[in-house]
């Protein structure tokens, strides 16, 4: 099964999607499953993992309802308040939602880089692990030092780094530090990495495929091709590339260097991680 391990749906309104910038008009509209079904079908994608875009229980419920209607959705990564005293009760209420695979918090949007190290947040993550839910770690590269500290406390939890931790591909600044942190994180065998979100960290209008090769080299070398999964980050990727383009960037790289692991990167790893 060919899997896109990272995409979003939303009913757009400016209040709830304030992270969408003034010059990002392509994202200022509704994105529902039928639009992605057409893209997926044209590019041989059999299923997707839809990931939260708003930090609300209501959105998580909405994504679960979409998964009941659209077989393309194989897994849901929702949002829950990890520091809420009623977290356990909320997780218990979802126990029969088999398509709900894990959760994500928009850590990249937290002004305090140590937000993820708060004891209550860490305890919430540990409770997710007890319920056998995965966790998507959405951070900027500058937050990698804190992420390393966090991951040291979660040696068994299935965790995936979203968007290769968002290095500054456009300028190339900070590459050495990003590389060192990613190599250290990859030593945790429970941690995976999504090859996703790269085009929007590059120069939107004039990126070249070669821009991404040093970053993919680091990720594949550090994590190995059995802990890396492809994600399109559709529709956000459309700020810089088409759906087939983001697939081709990774596909050509894998075909050239890891041809025997193509099915892993484009499906098997996501199936194993999310238990699709």
UniProtKB/Swiss-Prot annotation:
It holds the Pfam family Amidohydro_2. It comes from the Bacteria. Coiled coil: none annotated. Its EC number is 3.1.1.120. It catalyses: L-fucono-1,5-lactone + H2O = L-fuconate + H(+); L-fucono-1,4-lactone + H2O = L-fuconate + H(+); D-arabinono-1,4-lactone + H2O = D-arabinonate + H(+); L-xylono-1,4-lactone + H2O = L-xylonate + H(+). Catalyzes the hydrolysis of L-fucono-1,5-lactone to L-fuconate. Can also hydrolyze L-fucono-1,4-lactone, L-galactono-1,4-lactone D-arabinono-1,4-lactone and L-xylono-1,4-lactone. Belongs to the metallo-dependent hydrolases superfamily. It was not possible to determine the kinetic constants for the hydrolysis of L-fucono-1,5-lactone because of chemical instability, and thus, a stable mimic (4-deoxy-L-fucono-1,5-lactone) was utilized. This is L-fucono-1,5-lactonase. It comes from Pseudoalteromonas atlantica (strain T6c / ATCC BAA-1087).
């Amino acid at each position: 099964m060919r899997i896109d391990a990272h995409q979003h749906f939303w009913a757009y309104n400016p209040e709830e999607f304030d992270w969408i910038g003034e010059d990002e008009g392509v994202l200022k509209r509704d994105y529902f499953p039928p639009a992605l079904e057409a893209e997926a079908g044209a590019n041989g994608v059999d299923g997707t993992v839809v990931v939260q875009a708003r930090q609300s229980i209501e959105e998580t419920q909405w994504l679960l309802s979409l998964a009941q209607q659209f077989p393309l959705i194989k897994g849901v990564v929702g949002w829950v308040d990890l520091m809420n005293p009623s977290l356990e009760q909320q997780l218990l209420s979802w126990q029969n939602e088999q398509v709900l695979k894990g959760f994500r918090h928009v850590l990249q949007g937290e002004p305090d880089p140590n937000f993820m190290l708060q004891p209550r947040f860490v305890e919430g993550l540990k409770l997710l692990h007890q319920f056998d839910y995965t966790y998507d770690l959405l951070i900027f590269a500058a937050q990698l030092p804190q992420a390393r500290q966090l991951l040291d406390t979660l040696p068994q939890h299935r965790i995936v780094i979203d968007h290769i931790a968002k290095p500054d591909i456009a300028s190339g600044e900070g590459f050495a530090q990003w590389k060192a942190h990613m190599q250290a994180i990859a030593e945790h065998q429970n941690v995976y990495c999504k090859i996703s979100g790269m085009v929007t960290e590059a120069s939107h209008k004039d990126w070249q495929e070669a821009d991404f090769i040093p970053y993919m080299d680091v990720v594949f070398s550090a994590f190995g091709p059995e802990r890396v999964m492809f994600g399109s980050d559709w529709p956000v990727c459309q700020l810089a590339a088409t759906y087939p383009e983001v697939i081709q960037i990774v596909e050509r790289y894998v075909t050239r260097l890891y041809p025997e692991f193509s099915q892993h990167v484009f499906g098997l790893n996501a199936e194993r991680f999310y238990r699709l």
